[in-house]
């Protein structure tokens, strides 16, 4: 009843705000900062020594309508957090206000709807990381699709219609296999609760059926080779907020789904199919890195580099080692800081000034925009995985975990470090080095708002790289729970 009252009050307040003739983006920014403060309070009160889910609540429970978390009666949608979910929740609440700030002055058409969609997507992803049962996870997993579809379709570039349908067609088709697996789990176990699934042991044949359905959905969402072609198209046509959310948060749902859905319940099937995953991850890392070298669209270059980094994260999370699993989470979070910052540069700052994303038109940014050139160099080194950055910690541990599990695949995967340096330094040299291009002109350098966003993201990835113990304290119990011995 209490939660219902909050929901009704929020809907009424939201309706009144939309009826207001002023701009609602200030309210949404204020609300997102309040949400950040609330999650920080939860983080402070989170017990890192506990091996159980905390801050639990339940919705739509007809047998327990008051949503008491300590009740044994449960037929509703469960929500709660542990160290893993809290890590990604912190990433989410940090990126939401920064994403709102990214297009603060550039949306002239129906800006209220734009900021509403951005905040709504962020809230859905936040609840997705909070979900403790398969049904609520799937509902929220899919709820981002129509919102992202509308955002890209209305506010995207010239070919936004094709990009929006790519999002819907690819991800929805893959998620149907997840739905079938969840139905099988519900029928066999008579529960969809994450908390209880460690109590069950399934046959290998049944695990295989469920695992394949879940992995297909995760493979599309990551995305992995050969179902990765939709992401560069979507990034190239998305508005800035769409690219920042897609790279920073939505791709992390796939990594989170492996840790939350596959490893605890389907460990034997995971062992069986790990060689296949390693081959797919290796192909994803190498082929997308090589494809990056041939691209001329700035956003497509960053999109392909994101796919390559996620391939490394998948390699680590499937290594069945604490180093690999921890490294994959660190890499996922660090990528959630660096990639949105790069999209802000290429899809926000440069495109706003020069209205072109083709890399050949840019040269010698140090002449006209020296501060932006400095940010490009710093973020390029962070994206490569330079020491003291979170990307270095995540990639090093993920590759080490992969090497421990399979020395051949792990060793070959290390070529990703060289390829990342080649394509990222090539891009950086193109943008910042040499004499300024004839297509460029003197314009405003980085504004205070843009500096603030990039400084927050850079400082965040440096904190993870210099003090990885911060995340390790949160993830200790979670990571060790996912190590299995067969």
From Swiss-Prot:
Membrane topology per record: Multi-pass membrane protein
Keywords, sorted A to Z: Electron transport, Membrane, Mitochondrion, NAD, Respiratory chain, Translocase, Transmembrane, Transmembrane helix, Transport, Ubiquinone
Protein's cellular compartments: Mitochondrion membrane
Its EC number(s): 7.1.1.2
Molecular functions per Gene Ontology: NADH dehydrogenase (ubiquinone) activity; ubiquinone binding
Major localisation: mitochondrion
Catalytic activity: a ubiquinone + NADH + 5 H(+)(in) = a ubiquinol + NAD(+) + 4 H(+)(out)
One Gene Ontology term from the biological process aspect of the record: electron transport coupled proton transport
Family: Belongs to the complex I subunit 4 family.
Assembly, per entry: Complex I is composed of 37 different subunits.
Protein name: NADH-ubiquinone oxidoreductase chain 4
């Amino acid at each position: 009843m209490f939660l219902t009252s909050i929901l009704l009050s929020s809907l009424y307040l939201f309706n009144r705000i939309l009826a207001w003739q002023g701009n609602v983006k200030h309210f949404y920014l204020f609300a997102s900062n309040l949400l950040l403060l609330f999650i920080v309070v939860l983080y402070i009160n989170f017990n890192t020594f506990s091996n159980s889910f905390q801050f639990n609540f339940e919705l739509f429970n007809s047998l327990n309508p008051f949503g008491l978390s300590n009740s044994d009666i449960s037929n509703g949608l469960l929500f709660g957090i542990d160290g893993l979910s809290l890590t990604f929740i912190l990433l989410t609440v940090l990126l939401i206000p920064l994403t709102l700030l990214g297009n603060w002055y550039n949306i002239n058409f129906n800006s209220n709807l734009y900021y509403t969609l951005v905040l709504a997507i962020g809230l859905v992803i936040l609840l997705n990381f909070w979900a403790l049962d398969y049904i609520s996870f799937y509902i929220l997993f899919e709820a981002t699709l129509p919102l992202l579809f509308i955002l890209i379709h209305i506010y995207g570039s010239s070919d936004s219609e094709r990009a929006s349908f790519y999002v819907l067609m690819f991800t929805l088709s893959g998620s149907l296999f997840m739905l079938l697996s969840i139905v099988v789990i519900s029928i066999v176990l008579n529960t969809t609760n994450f908390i209880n699934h460690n109590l069950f042991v399934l046959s290998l044949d049944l695990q295989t059926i469920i695992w394949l359905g879940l992995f297909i959905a995760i493979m599309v969402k990551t995305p992995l080779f050969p179902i990765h072609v939709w992401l560069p198209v979507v990034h190239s046509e998305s508005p800035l907020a769409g690219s920042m959310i897609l790279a920073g948060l939505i791709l992390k749902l796939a990594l989170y789904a492996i840790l939350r859905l596959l490893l605890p319940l389907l460990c034997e099937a995971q062992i069986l199919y790990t060689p296949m995953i390693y081959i797919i991850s290796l192909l994803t890392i190498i082929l997308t890195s090589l494809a990056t070298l041939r691209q001329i669209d700035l956003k497509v270059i960053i999109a392909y580099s994101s796919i390559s980094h996620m391939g490394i994260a998948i390699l680590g999370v499937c290594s069945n080692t604490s180093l690999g699993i921890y490294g994959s989470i660190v890499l996922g979070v660090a990528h959630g800081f660096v990639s949105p910052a790069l999209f802000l540069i290429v899809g926000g700052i440069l495109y706003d000034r020069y209205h072109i994303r083709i890399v050949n038109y840019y040269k010698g940014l140090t002449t006209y925009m020296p501060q932006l050139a400095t940010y490009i160099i710093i973020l390029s080194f962070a994206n490569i995985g330079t020491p003291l950055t979170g990307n270095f910690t995540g990639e090093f541990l993920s590759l080490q975990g992969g090497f421990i599990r399979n020395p051949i695949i792990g060793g070959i995967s290390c070529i990703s470090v060289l390829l990342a340096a080649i394509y990222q330094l090539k891009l950086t040299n193109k943008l910042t080095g040499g004499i300024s291009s004839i297509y460029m002109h003197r314009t405003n350098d980085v504004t205070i708002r843009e500096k603030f966003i990039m400084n927050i993201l850079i400082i965040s990835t440096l904190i993870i790289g210099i003090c990885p113990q911060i995340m390790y304290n949160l993830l200790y119990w979670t990571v060790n729970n996912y190590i299995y011995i067969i």
